[in-house]
Amino acid sequence: KAIRRQRQMCIRDSYGADLYHRINWLGNIDGFIDRNVEKQQNGYLGEQVIAPEKILQKVDEEHIIIVAMEKKAAEQVMRLLRTAGYIKALDCFYIEDFLDFYTYQQYAFFAADKLMISSVCMIPSTVCNLKCKDCLNFSPYFKKHIIHDFTFVKRDIDTLFRWIDYTPRFQVSGGEPLLNKDLGRTLVYLDENYRNRIESIETVINGSIVPGDELCRLMKEHRIKVYLDDYRENVPQLRETYTQTVEKLEKYGIEWIDNYVPEWFSLDVEHTEHSDMTDLQLENYFDNCGSPWNCLENERLYSCNFAHFAAKAGIIEETENDYFDLKDYSEVRKTELLEFLLKYTTKGYVDFCKKCAGWSEANCNKVKVAEQIE
């Protein structure tokens, strides 16, 4: 449904503090709703606190209400709001429905005049020290790896943030990021220049190299989140370095995520053939795939990062349909970028769909994790 421009938000509180910190970048939170009289008198997190009775007397057309409570209480509050005349998904939202990315993204643009992107993936270097048979970045296919210097990377970052106001995730990936000499410099640049517009600055490492002390110091100081892949089951030579990496991250107090998965899915580009699909079938295939990742490279945003990786590896030819060119900034074109981020490409799909088995749930080709090419 359409979202009315400039509607302020009120948060029905319980988990409200967490939600407040997540969405305060929008700049249009107008307060909390709570029965607590002390909060009503003193405010909360610097915002006004409104009594529920005031909201329930009549529909407040100046605000939308986000219900941020545990399930049973949230359902009760939503019933009261609907009885009072509020319309679910227009005037009031469960927290999980509001944060559903398409709703959140469109609200940010049309109500708060802010452009956000679900995530950003950047690969300054494709160099990797593993040869995974089903690598989603197609590293084994590269005849010559691509390495961008810091000047190139910095330009891409600065260009992106001319266009967008916020992203929940910015991940500097690879290849193996620890083989990139400018990894620390890139992470520090993101934190020092754009931290107020990025919720989580991340990197992902494969456990084959123990990060150095200086990099660990920087990652701790600049609040970098590390995703640590766990390939020990199928690459046993990583067991020692994996353990040492965990110890190092713990020693420096770095936030890290155990990125273990029991199986991979294969994009299976060598055996997938969808060229007989009609345009409509390919559009539906692209929509059902639903890959949420956006890749940034050479001042371009790619709607499917796997299509971009495949083009870099020489598997397919890249076309203008695959990306949005960020070089020539225009306020008017921000609406075009929003549409592109919502996966509206010129064709309605990317040509790589014809050779790809799809992302995650759409893909039934399960394979061993990090199985190495001999």
Residue ranges of predicted features:
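Conserved AdoMet/S-adenosylmethionine-binding subsite of the radical SAM
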Residues: 180-298, 302-307, 312
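Phosphate-bearing ligand-interacting subdomains
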Residues: 37-106
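Short, polar loop motifs at secondary-structure junctions
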Residues: 33-39, 208
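Single conserved hydrophobic/aromatic residue that forms the stacking wall/gate
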Residues: 1-7, 11
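Local cysteine-cluster metal-coordination motifs and their immediate loop/turn environment
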Residues: 127-137, 290, 351-358
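Short internal beta-strands
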Residues: 30-35, 227-230
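Conserved alpha-helical substructure of the radical SAM core
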Residues: 100-203, 210-213
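C-terminal accessory region of radical SAM enzymes
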Residues: 253-267, 306-363
